[in-house]
Amino acid sequence: MSLHVLNDENVPNEKSSQCRDFQFLPPELTGRSSVLCLSQKENVPPQSQAKATNVTFQTPPRDPQTHRILSPNMTNKREAPFGLQNDHCVFLQKENQRPLAPVDDAPVVQMAAEILRAEGELQEGILTSSSLSASTSLLDSELVTPPIEPVLEPSHQGLEPVLESELVTPPVEPVLEPSHQELEPVLESELVTPPIEPVLEPSHQGLEPVLDSELVTPPIEPVLEPSHQGLEPVLESELVTPPIEPVLEPSHQGLEPVLDSELVTPPIEPVLEPSHQGLEPVLDSELVTPPIEPLLEPSHQGLEPVVDLKEESFRDPSEVLGTGAEVDYLEQFGTSSFKESAWRKQSLYVKFDPLLKDSPLRPMPVAPITNSTQDTEEESGSGKPTEAELVNLDFLGDLDVPVSAPTPVWSLEPRGLLPAEPIVDVLKYSQKDLDAVVNVMQQENLELKSKYEDLNTKYLEMGKSVDEFEKIAYKSLEEAEKQRELKEIAEDKIQKVLKERDQLNADLNSMEKSFSDLFKRFEKRKEVIEGYQKNEESLKKYVGECIVKIEKEGQRYQALKIHAEEKLRLANEEIAQVHSKAQAEVLALQASLRKAQMQNHSLEMTLEQKTKEIDELTRICDDLISKMEKI
């Protein structure tokens, strides 16, 4: 969601986009020009300059939201933020609130309004010959186009067709939630255009007509999402004058429309989709379809406080701008440097100077094409019934969006084609004409109301049939869902059976393979067993032969045993003899050994005696030698 500050011309740049009280995005550049744009740009000095040299005229500052004149005690008081739109909360106004007429400057304001209207008629006359579509879209400046009232939201309905206009598609206001109140007729003044009350809950009575002023026809805001509602036909008119931006006089209401002298096709805001509804076909305009703006959400605030007009006062431009700006409008009036923006300056001068009177001269207005306008209005009323409810105007929404479509011919300001007559104009229409137009509009509103009621009953019946169709569709969907579930279950079972079959086939194939292997092994074992049987027979024969041989060898063994026993007996006898001989020899040897030992012992004794004798002899010899040496 994006918030945009309105490009208000009566508030300087430093107060509109850079003020601490307005935390919004700076104003965007658009293709549409507003009233007094040139004069205001000349009057407001740029921020870079320290002092403005010449200021032609300065209007009092206005609140960017309500366009009210700011008095000295109101400069620091900002009211509720800009009117944004949301699906759930909207700005509601009082039920029985009536537009307030200007208090002091009514004649002056009338003259200013006539000047603006004359200028618009002049531009329309200039552009009529060049473009037929432009002339058809500018017919509303001559006659009052009745406001298109939105249709009350029925409680339980189905589709919501939105039939848009064929020639010029105005912005559509959101249809608010229904209430149990009655819409009262609002007869707007010829000069001051107050806001139109929002649509409240649907009343149990008939809808009352709402007539706009001769200069301004309020637009229709986009249709919001109905919460728990069904079919809601929103039928728009074929010829709707786009909103005019600047406001001539302040009023005591929350939202005020903005008047614009140059006719520019306003952007169409998107139609939101309903939350609990069916399809909503939108038939676009056939000729001109302006760019679509995103829908903004309103802040959750109540109604703006009603400001007393007594507190409003005119402020000097030097107090507002903080520079020594001089008002030299009267000095430049009538000179050669009087530019074509003086039309707007003179209109402001006429508005704020009660001493200036009407001029006997008036510009030549373009002849109004009343018959074609009424015919087109009748065709639009008979061919495409409009909504029968009054909707809330949102002139403070996002209007500063670049226009993607080519600029209309009628939006271009003609240069050098301004008449030389004085600007001040007298009233063109009398009160009787206004009353006649009001009566015509009331009759048209009654016809539209009856058509709406017929369409509403048809749509209610259609909603019932659609509900039955939805029930049947739900039942068929449930049955289809059940069938689908059963089909899925059957498919699952089939898949399981197929898997089991594949498994059994695989098992069977493996069993066949194993059986073939087993049979081959059986054949091999059979051959082996046959070989074993042959071997057994041959072995049995060999065992019989071996038994015969063993018996023969046993007999031989017995014979050898007897022979060996005899040989052993003989050998034992010989051994006994040898033993006896050996013992006798051992005894003889032992005796000889004893004898040898005795001899050896005796020899050892004699050796010892000899050694002793030798020792004594050697001692004696030593003694003798020693004695001999001494001698």
From Swiss-Prot:
The keyword Phosphoprotein applies. Residues 431-630 form a coiled coil. The modification N-acetylserine is found at S2. Embryonically expressed. Residues 311-366, 384-631 are annotated as: Necessary but not sufficient for spindle localization. The keyword Cytoplasm applies. GO terms for biological process: astral microtubule organization; cell division; cell population proliferation; cerebral cortex development; hemopoiesis; interkinetic nuclear migration; microtubule cytoskeleton organization; mitotic spindle organization. Residues 42-70, 363-385 are annotated as: Disordered. Residues 42-59 have a biased composition (Polar residues). Pfam families: TACC_C. One of its GO terms (molecular function) is protein domain specific binding. The modification Phosphoserine is found at S39, S71, S347. It is found in: Cytoplasm; Cytoplasm, Cytoskeleton, Microtubule organizing center, Centrosome; Cytoplasm, Cytoskeleton, Spindle pole. One of its GO terms (cellular component) is glutamatergic synapse. Keywords: Acetylation, Cell cycle, Cell division, Coiled coil, Cytoplasm, Cytoskeleton, Mitosis, Phosphoprotein. Belongs to the TACC family. Plays a role in the microtubule-dependent coupling of the nucleus and the centrosome. Involved in the processes that regulate centrosome-mediated interkinetic nuclear migration (INM) of neural progenitors. Acts as a component of the TACC3/ch-TOG/clathrin complex proposed to contribute to stabilization of kinetochore fibers of the mitotic spindle by acting as inter-microtubule bridge. The TACC3/ch-TOG/clathrin complex is required for the maintenance of kinetochore fiber tension. May be involved in the control of cell growth and differentiation. May have a role in embryonic development. Interacts with GCN5L2 and PCAF. The coiled coil C-terminal region interacts with AH receptor nuclear translocator protein (ARNT) and ARNT2. Interacts with CCDC100/CEP120. Interacts with CKAP5 independently of clathrin. Interacts with CKAP5 and clathrin forming the TACC3/ch-TOG/clathrin complex located at spindle inter-microtubules bridges; TACC3 (phosphorylated at Ser-347 by AURKA) and CLTC are proposed to form a composite microtubule interaction surface. This is Transforming acidic coiled-coil-containing protein 3. It comes from Mus musculus (Mouse).
